Amino acid sequence: MTARFNHTIIASSDPQKMKSFYGDLLEAAEAPSWGPFQNLIIGDGVLLQFATPPGDFQPQHYAYLLDDDHFDRAYDLIQGRGIEHWADPQRMQEGRINHEHDGRGVYLLDPSGHYLELITRAYL
């Protein structure tokens, strides 16, 4: 396989706020922004672009694989900022993390209402 993931546009009600939120949570690197895009770079050089679409948008699910130390820092940030979070995607186990797939995981909403999942072990 030679295909690799390069970039995605994440629909945002406030691109600058989203850039700040994701930058803090994912410890993402600053990237030059242009036009309607506020940009960050995460692992493997993947570009996250935040932009406001012309109309309404449906929430999406984005999962990020973190190492254990990064997960600890991200979870401390989530708790420190009082961000509502859950151990499960159905949002039944509020304020908890899970221990699925021999790792840890947590679900939360970003400022534009997208579902984020932070995990320490890949599913496959």
Role assignments for model-derived ranges:
Residues 44-47, 55-57, 67-72:
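Short, charged/polar surface micro-motifs in flexible loops or helix N-caps
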Residues 52-57, 123-124:
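A short, sequence-level motif marking secondary-structure junctions
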Residues 8, 62:
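Hydrophobic adenine-recognition pocket in adenosine-nucleotide-binding enzymes
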Residues 63-115, 123:
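Vicinal oxygen chelate
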Residues 2, 9-47, 54:
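Core segments of cupin and vicinal oxygen chelate
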Residues 48-51, 107, 116-119:
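Conserved beta-strand in the GNAT
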Residues 2-4, 55-59, 99-100:
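Short glycine-enriched loop/turn motifs at secondary-structure junctions
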